[in-house]
Amino acid sequence: HFNLWDVPGAAVVVRWYNRLQQFAEETRLGIPVTIASDPRSHFSRSIYEMQARDFSQWCQPLGMAAIGDKELVRQFADFVRQEYVAVGMRVALHPQIDLATEPRWPRINGTFGEDAALSARLATAYIAGFQGEALGPESVACMTKHYPGGGPQKEGLDPHFSFHLGQVYPGDNFDYHLIPFKAAIEAKTAAIMP
């Protein structure tokens, strides 16, 4: 399993992926390699997201939440799924369905906002667009993140860094942050990232 970070373009991804798969096929067990990607279809220069380059460019998930159209989110995910499959990416390290309840957290734009019910509806559509009704040869598996919710990070600091791990659930609202994850599980997300 590889997480593909920054690349100069789709043609480079395809060449690299094909060489990597050829190498894997020539090993004793011949187990294929899985290529994963963080979101790369948004027009953004955030350090948490990949530049779109040759991929289609869409608004951030927070923008999609502002529109509030579940079918638009499903169409977006289906379109991006086709792009991922074309270059060999089979795991999407998204959707990020944390609830944006800590305004200092720098990853809010990658969420569907602070409304748990809206996030749950849009996450379900997102997963359906990438995975289809069931995982199959044309699916891209979603790894929904960050359970149990990265949105309430203490002082807005990101938990990817060991110097500050901790979440705050003011008003004892931990269960509220679980609502989108319950919906993702019901939608049969392929995986969940802590």
What are these regions (language model features)?
Residues H1-P194:
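Glycoside hydrolase catalytic-domain context in secreted enzymes
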